[in-house]
Amino acid sequence: MKLLRLKITDPDGFRSLSCDFEHHFRTELSLQDELAQANDFAPFVCAGPNGSGKSNLLEALAAIFFQLEVLRVRRSFLPEALQDEAPDVSPVAFELDYLIRVPAEYRSPDSPPWAKVGVWKKAGESVRIQWENQADFSTDVYQAFKGGHADILLPQYVLGYSSGENEILSLPFFKMRFVQFDEYLNALTQQLSYPGHPETRLAYLDSGFSQAILLCNLLFQDEATLQAFREDVGIEALREFRIILRHRIPLDTVQLEAFDLADEDQKRERRNRIQAEARTRGLTESEISQSVDDWVRREIIKGNPALSETDEPGSTRYRLNLLQLLDGDEKSSLVVSALKRCATLSYIDDAGDALVLDYWVNEETRQAFRENFDGSALVLFQAFQVLLTLNLYAVSETLKTDLYTSTSHYVSETVPTLASDQRIMRFKFVRFTKQGVAEPMMLKELSDGEHQLLHSLGLCLLFRETNSLFLLDEPETHFNPDWRANFISRLRQCLPGNGEFAQEMLITTHTPFLISDSKPEKVLVFAKDEATGAVSVEPPGFNTFGASINKITMSKVFGKHETIGGHAEALLDEMRTRFEKGDENKDALISEIDRKLGDSIEKVLLIKAILDSDQPGTGEALD
């Protein structure tokens, strides 16, 4: 994928991006250069002061692709709260142009590899998409958003990650996570088949997916691919892990009745039949009245193999097996069955109604995973995605409806966090060997920076063979300087480029190292006019690739003209003032400066000025 142009036409703008904000990601010349070097991956690096609008660009793209994804999944399943033809979702008006690689089956020998796509939305209307060069391909007549073309004109995945708590970026992804859960619950209610992977393409891969990302990569990737992990964090081999799957959750009577597929006429007919059968058994009207609701519920339970009833008294004696569509017999290709076949040991924990799967990892274990998950780390990860999403079962229908229509920055805080033993899926005892550490260690023992590096690079490794859009908001905040300096190189290792796959990535950063490893056409410098609040995006104005950290820091990218900290600068200014007054012994002042301050260009210049003041024709004041 290659972004070309974004314009916000929403009269209210989008966050700090005003109406008529427009950015061209590539010039025609730079685009042609990129297309000629298809295997040379390089992300866009968005830089600028805090509050300059760089994260808002990522948020706008996420919001736009959320609207496109809602339109795409409307053909299969969509919650009622999102079924409005023109949902009031910000931005309500925009234009977006991009290129995306077209699958080989849609191309003829003379077709170009890239489709040019135009997306636009006007206020009060549905989002539209147009395949602008469709005539160059082996497809049907010219059309907008129809049939299978929606699938090939959109990125395979739109992936979000933030090292902090960027609620605005995560909100559209968070909504899609609930769409994924509701899609599964709908299939469970209707007893439909379920593919075992998410139908939605938007995924916000926060820290809750860290263990899944690491496991999938260590189980599937070869040594060369894992080099990015090895070189910085020192991860060696996966030793063991446990998966715990809870089968059943309690249902109250209202939740149980939501599984009743009968219409009103059928419900009335069923109730009359049950009452008539009770009368033939000689029950009184009073006895029938007391029990008829329970009898109806038992018929609902009989109609759905995921439902059951316990002997416990009260209204929560009903149970739902949330894993019912994912579990089968020993030879089944369903997710839980496949995980069982890969396990070293499995057993049922009756106390917790849970399936426990233990894995002691060796080459046979890896081979079992390859055989059961199509030889793909991504297929296994998507299976984990489905299982982890089931942990959202505790969210009420009312809260989900509010969430689907919410614009709140704090929506995730309203979602309950389950205790570990209440979750449908959880990992335990993920242990691996690490260079310089005698005993296998657990993921939780790693530092924040190690977590962050494994997470961000692991995400790239999983989706390396896809045409995806990555939106990474300050992914390197916990890195040491060496890791920051190498981060772009590590990304290039993980996404080396392939003729059939082309990823687009935008990274926001405050790190000059990322800019020093990027060509100027891939550096977007953000600034906000203090008077008008207007956000502008400009090129850096100099060759950033290989530029020194001081050069980048002191340029308009960050606008910091000092190379030392504020407290040290204040002390240096005080010493400069003392020198300019002319009352100080110069040798003593130089000794004091040298003793109190470390080496810096500012210190050198001040000492030089003091020494030069003794030369004929020089003044003692500094300009």
Task: Provide a role label for each language-model segment.
Residues Q156-Y157, S163-I168, P195-R242, R248-P250, ...:
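P-loop NTPase catalytic cores that bind/hydrolyze ATP
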Residues D33-A38, T189-A203:
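Aromatic- and Gly/Pro-rich amphipathic surface segment
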Residues M1-E80, A394, T398-G566:
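Switch/communication elements of ASCE P-loop NTPase nucleotide-binding domains
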Residues A150, L159, E165-N166, Q493, ...:
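RecA-like P-loop NTPase motor core
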Residues R107-G164, L169-L188:
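Glycine-rich phosphate-binding loops of NTPases
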Residues I168-Y194, T563-E580:
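Short linear, low-complexity motifs centered on an aromatic residue
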Residues K2-R15, R26-E28, F209-H451, G458-L469, ...:
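Extended helical coiled-coil dimerization/tether regions that scaffold
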Residues L58-S126:
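Conserved P-loop NTP-binding catalytic core
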